[in-house]
Amino acid sequence: VCTHMDNDHICGLIQVLKGTNFNFIENVWYNGFLQIVNSRFYSQKENIFTEKDNKILDEIISQGMLLDVDQEVGINEGMSLGVLIEERRIPLNSAARGQAICSELVKNKYEIAPSIFITILGPSKDNIIELEEYWKKEMVSRNYMFRVSDKRRLTEAFEYQIERIKAIYANECFKISENEDLMKYIGGLTERDESIVNRSSISFILEYNDKKFLF
């Protein structure tokens, strides 16, 4: 289960899928471009705006993933998680028949192994729609006209763009020297935690026998 598009989650999984020992993965739960964005935004006929749209996607992809300064794992070849899942032909979101993992589509306990169950708490369909709307707004601000149907390039650009949207909510790091600084820092954390990217994350309870674990 990849709960959300964050570099500290995605980059490690990308390294696994880029290797040769990934056959132990039978299924992936992950809400990517095809699960979040309605097909009408990538199924339009090409027209005079297509070349311009491709340049916008190229710009986003060329910037790649935002990485932390001290992060050792990175994307060497600009390959996104969604693209790798498709290329490796790994079943995606089987519990939701390939659609987005959300509380409305996976309503009951889902048995992933003998005596091991997952109960989806979130996101909701509304959270998914809200993230889609935010992404569309960001793309429109770039004068994107939604005239590209290349799912691979769209998937890659989408993941990179979402990471940057999340960064908008991140609180700037600063040294806490006084109580007032601490309150500002806490306030910043609250704003970050309420971002649409975090609200659209997959949250769930993992159950095994009489034990429950919250993720």
Where are these regions (language model features)?
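Flexible, acidic/histidine-containing loops and adjacent segments that form or flank the divalent-metal
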Residues: 15-212
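Residue-level marker for buried hydrophobic side chains located in beta-strands
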Residues: 1, 213-215
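Metallo-beta-lactamase
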Residues: 1-8
